[in-house]
């Protein structure tokens, strides 16, 4: 009886270990891109995520990308080839997606469904889809691989009104829309960051020079903070697969939890 019990425990332990995500992929723009810019003055949160988890982070975020260009120009095709069963893919866009397809070669078509607009970019005809369509496409391909897509709202700009961070653009809501439709995890990254910035205060962030070049791109310290906000989301929302891969350093990340208004 004791031997059978021990064998069962060992099998459960082996199963648990095998089920823990070993790879995290990131699809996104410069706010997540970990390659750094502006002579090291700025960086993205994807560079620091691996400091808090035991899984390997594969950061495919590319500066300047929108959901449309990430799909069109091959960045997504490269990422999805590497994804395996049990992996997680973090998907975050919204900063470069503004503007319609005719006025911006990065902009999506209007709407939330299967609407399309055909445009010509640099002499090449392109069928442009809606922003949610691209996110659904990415997420469904991840699911087909036996992996888990996790969508995040975009990061806030350094913009204050009476000591508060304004509400996010429509792209944050689009991420929540796709999350609800496909029943996949959603972290309101914007909300975690914004509410915790407000606790710190605008003056503190200015003193720290967290936005050394513009209102969008973070210093390394601020990018690390944004990575911590991803960890906060994982903890606050008790995303079990990801809680299981948090390391000791993640234990030092203790910020208030905030319910998403989306």
Model-assigned labels for residue ranges:
Residues 17-62, 77-89, 105-112:
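Serine-esterase "nucleophile elbow" of acetyl-processing enzymes
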Residues 67-78:
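N-terminal post-signal-peptidase region of extra-cytosolic proteins
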Residues 28, 44, 61-64, 94, ...:
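Glycine-centered flexibility sites
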Residues 36-40, 70-72, 161-166:
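Short, solvent-exposed loop/turn segments at secondary-structure boundaries
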Residues 78-220, 224, 228-247:
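Alpha-helical cap/lid subdomain in secreted, periplasmic
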Residues 30, 63-65, 155, 192:
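Short, solvent-exposed coil/turn elements at secondary-structure transition points
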Residues 1-18:
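Fungal secretory targeting signals
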Residues 246-262:
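A short, charged, Gly/Pro-tolerant segment at domain boundaries
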């Amino acid at each position: 009886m004791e031997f059978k019990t021990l064998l069962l425990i060992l099998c459960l332990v082996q199963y648990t270990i095998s089920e823990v995500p070993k790879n995290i992929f990131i699809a996104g723009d410069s706010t997540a891109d970990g390659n750094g810019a502006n002579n090291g003055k700025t960086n993205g949160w994807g560079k620091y995520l691996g400091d808090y988890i035991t899984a390997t982070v594969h950061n495919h975020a590319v500066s300047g990308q929108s959901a449309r260009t990430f799909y069109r120009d091959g960045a997504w095709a490269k990422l999805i080839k590497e994804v395996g069963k049990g992996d997680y893919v973090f998907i975050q866009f919204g900063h470069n997606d503004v503007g319609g397809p005719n006025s911006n070669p990065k902009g999506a078509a209007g709407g939330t469904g299967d609407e399309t607009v055909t445009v010509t970019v640099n002499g090449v005809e392109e069928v442009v889809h809606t922003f949610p369509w691209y996110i659904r496409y990415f997420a469904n391909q991840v699911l087909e691989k036996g992996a888990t897509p996790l969508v995040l709202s975009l990061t806030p700009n350094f913009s204050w009104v009476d000591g508060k961070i304004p509400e996010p653009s429509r792209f944050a809501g689009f991420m929540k829309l796709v999350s609800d439709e496909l029943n996949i995890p959603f972290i309101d990254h914007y909300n975690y960051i914004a509410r915790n910035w407000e606790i710190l205060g605008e003056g503190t962030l200015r003193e720290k020079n967290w936005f050394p070049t513009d209102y969008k791109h973070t210093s390394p310290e601020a990018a690390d903070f944004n990575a911590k906000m991803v960890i906060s989301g994982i903890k606050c929302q008790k995303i079990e697969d990801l809680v299981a891969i948090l390391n000791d350093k993640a234990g030092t990340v203790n910020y208030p939890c905030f319910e998403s208004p989306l």
